Design a protein with these regions (language model features):
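Residue-level recognition of single "structural anchor" positions
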Residues: 1-283
């Protein structure tokens, strides 16, 4: 008969994962096998995605910022080989779209996919469906948003783009650092956006949080995701922790509490309890 992982061990595993530990370092820290760690991640991640899909509704946001962050699964696009797609697998670039409430810091929605018009449109339609009122929306200058935003919101949005102007980087900086930003342009697209609030600072900070707190997003390591399903599960878990379980330093409460979606700070055990499935310890 297989041994079931104790709740204490489950809490240790999930705590390590949301604090930026890789799967293998989590194995070393907790003594739980790699297979069991991944099964727990998969189960809890799906439960977190389902819970947030139901709970994050009718959000009374006023200002929303949207951005997308790059990562990859299996191999970078330039290194993908036919064997990566064996058994229905996926390899290559993966983008995560994020929409954050600039006031409460609640991540209203996220989507994992390609950086293209189709994914942008689907993502923004989901964002629009979770809001209870008209918002001011800011994105970067990517052209895909010019069609995706009106498709999702029509004219019922104050939409602006913050377009960054970049200079040339030196040869060494091109590989390890973004190009030097020389300035920005604020461009009104729909409605009457307030220029004081045309910003992507909060969502860009959230991108940093993702890179810091999910090891599979950290550049120049071998901790990248090997399976798309695990990548998606970790992103759902990360956002559950961010929205419901982690106190924001400035707000002094969680984003979900600030947004009126939760009455308390969730514990890791509560997050795990979203799924009641026992997970057998791998031999």
């Amino acid at each position: 008969m297989a041994n079931v992982i104790s709740m204490v061990k489950k809490v240790a595993v999930i705590s390590a994962l949301v604090e930026g530990c890789s799967v293998r370092s989590t194995v070393r820290l907790t003594g739980v096998s790699k297979g069991a760690v991944l099964r727990l991640l998969s189960s809890v991640g799906k439960a977190c995605a389902d819970y947030q899909d139901a709970a994050i509704r009718n959000v009374p946001a006023r200002r929303v910022q949207v951005d997308e962050i790059w990562s990859y699964v299996g191999a970078k696009a330039k290194n993908v080989k036919p064997e990566h797609f064996e058994n229905g697998g996926y390899a290559g670039d993966v983008w995560t779209f994020t929409a954050i409430d600039a006031d409460t810091k609640l991540v209203i929605s996220w989507a994992v996919g390609a950086r293209d018009a189709g994914c942008a449109a689907s993502f923004l339609q989901d964002v629009a469906g979770r809001l209870s009122n008209r918002i001011q929306l800011t994105t970067d200058g990517h052209r895909m948003y010019l069609d995706a935003v009106p498709d999702a919101f029509g004219e019922a949005v104050d939409f602006a783009q913050l377009v960054k102007v970049y200079g040339d980087a030196t040869e060494g900086q091109k590989r390890y650092s973004p190009a030097l930003c020389l300035g920005t342009k604020r461009i009104d697209i729909i409605g009457d956006p307030d220029h004081k609030f045309i910003s992507t600072s909060y969502v860009e900070r959230q991108n940093l949080n993702m890179r810091m707190n999910m090891r599979r997003f950290t550049r120049l390591t071998n901790a990248f995701s090997k399976k798309l399903e695990n990548h998606v599960a970790m992103i759902a878990l990360f956002h559950m922790h961010h929205n419901f379980a982690r106190i924001h330093q400035t707000l002094r409460v969680t984003p979900a509490m600030e947004a009126g979606l939760s009455s308390h700070v969730w514990s890791i055990q509560e997050v795990i309890s979203l799924t009641a499935e026992p997970l057998a310890k791998a031999a």
